[in-house]
Each structure stands twice: as structure tokens, then as C-alpha cells.
């Protein structure tokens, strides 16, 4: 669920998902249209695509289980659908961490008019 995603981002990337990623670029926080503006926005685009492939449960609401083993996140496999959600969130959190250096404040809270291009396929 979204609260778990926030906690996972904090654990992996060391920053708040709500503060840093809830309104960034064309895909972080608002659903998504257009083309990703940078590597961070692409993390959100890929995350949106990943959530789009989850059909048997609700990625924004359903609870999943994971553990941390020497800093690595391990999604539990008790329920295949919630494991999928966990894997989506884990990949995004790692992507945010790996692209911290490219984060650009100019993409924070950009007007949606800047996101009108046709979206690329997932």
C-alpha cells in the first residue's frame, strides 16, 4: 500500500517519498502523462507501468510483507499478487536511491501543460 511504499523509500533511498516524489515531473504522484522528464521521473513511469500489470489486487491499498537482509529488501512470497506489488515498490525505491544525484528541483510541481506529449508505451 502507499504507506508501505513511503516507508520502503525511506529505508532504501533515505528520504521521504511524500516530500521528494509526490509531485515531481510528469509521473511522480499524479498518475502520469507525457514523457518522463529525467531519470527520477522515469523511476515513477516504470513504477506506474509495474502497478498497471498487477490485476489481482490493489497496489495502492493492499498490504504486503517484506524483510530486510543486510540492507537488501526481500519481498515475501506468501501471496503472489502482493509480492508483485512489493517488487514494484522495491524497484522504484532502488531507482530513487540510484538516481538521487540527478534529482532536479525544476521538475518539482511542474505544470501539467509540460506533460502533454504522447506517452511512450510501458
Curated annotation (Swiss-Prot):
It comes from the Eukaryota. Expressed by the venom gland. Disulfide bonds join 26-115, 28-44, 43-95, 49-122, 50-88, 57-81, 75-86. Preincubation with heparin slightly increase the enzymatic activity. GO terms for biological process: arachidonate secretion; lipid catabolic process; negative regulation of T cell proliferation; phospholipid metabolic process. Ca(2+) binds at residues 27, 29, 31, 48. Monomer (predominant). Non-covalently linked homodimers are also observed. This is Acidic phospholipase A2 5. It comes from Trimeresurus stejnegeri.
Amino acid at each position: 500500500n502507499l504507506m508501505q511504499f513511503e516507508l520502503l523509500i525511506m529505508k532504501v533511498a533515505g528520504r521521504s517519498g511524500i516530500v521528494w516524489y509526490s509531485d515531481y515531473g510528469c509521473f511522480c504522484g499524479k498518475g502520469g502523462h507525457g514523457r518522463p522528464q529525467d531519470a527520477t521521473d522515469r523511476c515513477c513511469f516504470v513504477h506506474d507501468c509495474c502497478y498497471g500489470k498487477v490485476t489481482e489486487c490493489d497496489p495502492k491499498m493492499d498490504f504486503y510483507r517484506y524483510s530486510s537482509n543486510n540492507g537488501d529488501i526481500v519481498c515475501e512470497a506468501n501471496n503472489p499478487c502482493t509480492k508483485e506489488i512489493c517488487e514494484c515498490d522495491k524497484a522504484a525505491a532502488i531507482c530513487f536511491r540510484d538516481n538521487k544525484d540527478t534529482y532536479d528541483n525544476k521538475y518539482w510541481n511542474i505544470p501539467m501543460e509540460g506533460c502533454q506529449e504522447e506517452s511512450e508505451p510501458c
